[in-house]
Amino acid sequence: MEVDILSEDENSMLHRTDIQFEIAHEDATPSRLSVRDSLAAKINKDSDEVVVHKLDTKFGMRKTIGYAKVYDSPQSARQVEQDYMLKRNKIEIESEDEDSAAEGA
């Protein structure tokens, strides 16, 4: 699987970079997690800092166009992203019990 970055837009207010990318693949559309790991390796980031939002493969084509958000830290991703998107990308969500325990310590 080969990842090519098409565009990068810096969003300093939300501590992230929005990336559009293209993937060339031989078999079926790769999973969201394998795309996330490949993209993270390409841009030298931790996979918890990358949230893949969209993967679009045209019928019969062996390339996929995607959209991802790359955050400065995993904490920034947890603060900004919605829970369902974090679950799709297998990023751990901090529960309220953990937050209140951390505040009380």
Curated annotation (Swiss-Prot):
Signal peptide: none annotated. PROSITE patterns: RIBOSOMAL_S24E. Keywords: Ribonucleoprotein, Ribosomal protein. One of its GO terms (molecular function) is structural constituent of ribosome. It comes from the Archaea. One of its GO terms (biological process) is translation. HAMAP family: Ribosomal_eS24. This is Small ribosomal subunit protein eS24. It comes from Haloquadratum walsbyi (strain DSM 16790 / HBSQ001). The lineage of its organism: Archaea, Methanobacteriati, Methanobacteriota, Stenosarchaea group, Halobacteria. The gene is rps24e.
